[in-house]
Regions:
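Acidic/polar loop patches that form or flank catalytic/metal-binding clefts of enzymes
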Residues: 30-31, 99-100, 125-126, 140-145
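Conserved PLP-binding active-site segment of the aspartate aminotransferase-like
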Residues: 103-105, 112-123, 143-148, 152-162, ...
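Extended hydrophobic/aromatic segments used for targeting, binding, or gating
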Residues: 107, 112, 121, 128-130, ...
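Ser/Thr/Pro-rich, low-complexity mucin-like regions
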Residues: 190-207
Length: 229
């Protein structure tokens, strides 16, 4: 492609809290993009008659924070890649938990989110949400996801346009299969990676107790629904 986009939102590998960067080797796109973020003024600071633009210029403070991180990024990425490889090798020995395998054509990964694939058949049909809650109780930073069309800003737009999205396979994945671990977890040491794996193993080995908790939670939820009615 002609344009690359990188976010610097607080959860990213490099962060300044918010903002991002756009990269391009296309001179025409470069001139228009600068005008878009600089109140319509291009690289030569002259007004672009086609583009009004906004004030999206990055502050010097944010740039300084990012420059410091840029120097550390190569060594941090190397550490993450090494720890992710270790974690994958441990998961390969466990039934019921898989991960997104990297395409062999990819020569280098940013390691932003590590995605787990949960198979409840190996965990006595415990729901994904209960499994995730158990892992968090063991100190593992996992989270479930949601579909973007369920977010308030998208829901309002879809309602206005009378669009009813229907993505059943995606719904199943986010509700029953997919868990993510943030990238900064893999900046730890070898012991940290083994601790994460051991936490998953502990939850699996105590599945009967977790099953009882899951049933109790469902009963409680039904009772609360009856009371609210």
């Amino acid at each position: 492609g002609d344009i690359g986009i990188f976010s610097f939102e607080q959860s990213k590998a490099m962060t300044s809290g918010e903002g991002g960067i756009i990269t391009t080797n296309n001179k025409h796109y470069y001139q228009d993009l600068v005008a878009l973020i600089n109140l319509g003024r291009g690289p030569d600071n002259k007004k672009n008659k086609k583009i009004i633009g906004w004030n999206f210029r990055m502050s010097e403070f944010h740039a300084a924070v990012l420059m410091a991180q840029l120097n550390r990024f190569p060594s941090q990425l190397e550490e993450k890649v090494k720890n992710i490889a270790l974690f994958e090798s441990l998961l390969d020995e466990m039934n019921g938990i898989d991960y997104i395998h990297q395409d062999k054509r990819i020569s280098r990964s940013g390691g932003f989110l590590f995605t787990l694939k949960y198979n409840s058949r190996f965990f006595d049909l415990i729901p994904l949400s209960i499994f995730a809650k158990a892992l968090r109780a063991e100190g593992v930073l996992v989270r479930t996801r949601d579909l973007s069309y369920n977010s308030p800003e998208v829901v309002n737009y879809l309602r206005k346009e009378n669009i009813k999205p229907y993505c059943p396979n995606a719904d199943i994945v986010v509700k029953e299969v997919l868990l993510t671990i943030p990238h900064h977890v893999f900046l730890g040491n070898v012991d940290d990676i083994h601790n994460i794996f051991n936490a998953i193993l502990k939850v699996k080995n105590n599945i009967k107790e977790l099953k009882g908790y899951s049933i109790a939670s469902k009963v409680k939820s039904k009772l609360l629904n009856i009371i609210s009615i």
